[in-house]
Swiss-Prot record:
Name listed for the protein in its UniProt record: Small heat shock protein IbpB
GO cellular component: cytoplasm
InterPro entries noted in UniProt: A-crystallin/Hsp20_dom, ACD_IbpA/B, HSP20-like_chaperone, HSP20_IbpB
Family: Belongs to the small heat shock protein (HSP20) family.
Source species, domain of life: Bacteria
Residue span(s) of domain sHSP: 26-137
Taxonomic lineage from the root: Bacteria, Pseudomonadati, Pseudomonadota, Gammaproteobacteria, Enterobacterales
Organism name: Shigella boydii serotype 18 (strain CDC 3083-94 / BS512)
Role description: Associates with aggregated proteins, together with IbpA, to stabilize and protect them from irreversible denaturation and extensive proteolysis during heat shock and oxidative stress. Aggregated proteins bound to the IbpAB complex are more efficiently refolded and reactivated by the ATP-dependent chaperone systems ClpB and DnaK/DnaJ/GrpE. Its activity is ATP-independent.
Cellular compartment(s): Cytoplasm
Subunit structure, as described in the record: Homodimer. Forms homomultimers of about 100-150 subunits at optimal growth temperatures. Conformation changes to oligomers at high temperatures or high ionic concentrations. The decrease in size of the multimers is accompanied by an increase in chaperone activity.
UniProt keyword list: Chaperone, Cytoplasm, Stress response
Coiled coil: none
Length: 142
């Protein structure tokens, strides 16, 4: 029998908490750039990406349907450096997150190398039952 670890997929599905929490605890590898997904309450979430060395103009956030995409294209240095140790990555990246229905991006900020994307769940008002009056005459001409 083969086991598949779906937690790396589920951690990017925001708003699907019960299923995501069950699978996320199995352990997962990090990708570049490192990021956190924070849940403030049942309707408010925040994605934070650590982007040291990036500028605001290097970043692009796009929401298409339920897919939230974040792309970064850093400015390349004029001359190639010789590294003794390179622990900080400054490379182009593209991340995408699948949002649950009714999730919306409420704003984004870039402060001190951290990109914060705030999300809110807007539950639609339930459609109230409509009472239909019954008349004595037929509704259709027959």
């Amino acid at each position: 029998m083969r086991n598949f670890d779906l937690s790396p997929l589920m951690r990017q599905w925001i708003g699907f908490d019960k299923l995501a929490n069950a699978l996320q605890n199995a352990g997962e590898g990090q990708s570049f750039p490192p990021y956190n997904i924070e849940k403030s309450d049942d309707n408010h979430y925040r994605i934070t990406l650590a982007l040291a060395g990036f500028r605001q103009e290097d970043l692009e956030i796009q929401l298409e349907g339920t897919r939230l995409s974040v792309k970064g294209t850093p400015e390349q240095p004029k001359e190639e450096k010789k590294w003794l140790h390179q622990g900080l990555m400054n490379q182009p990246f593209s991340l995408s997150f699948t949002l649950a229905e009714n999730m919306e991006v409420s704003g984004a900020t870039f402060v001190n190398g951290l990109l914060h994307i705030d999300l809110i769940r807007n539950e639609p008002e339930p459609i109230a039952a409509q009472r239909i009056a019954i008349s004595e005459r037929p509704a259709l001409n027959s």
